[in-house]
């Protein structure tokens, strides 16, 4: 199975999470590709059976608005029928950005197949294990 992890990271925290998600996908027998928003056009995602999206909370608990949000908005309606999952880190607040993102996905018909993974600041071992489990669940 061909899978993708599409992520934006400003500090390296979400990038570390993305790598762990890809490890989980690979451990479950999938081919995993790591991509940044700049590397993704809407039609590109048709090549993947499962896609994990990662983005940290920015500002007032929103998705990164310059690169990630425009890419995701352009792609989300074409994700119907694909297995998808979300992950990301945040520095303050209570994770509202993830709940808003999940609701946006639900409204767009995105098939979120497992619970999203969030962590505060730098992911610890437990968060990285949760990311690996997310990658595995997305593939199975």
Identify the meaning behind each predicted range.
Residues 7-11:
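Aromatic-flanked redox-active Cys/Sec active sites in thiol-based oxidoreductases
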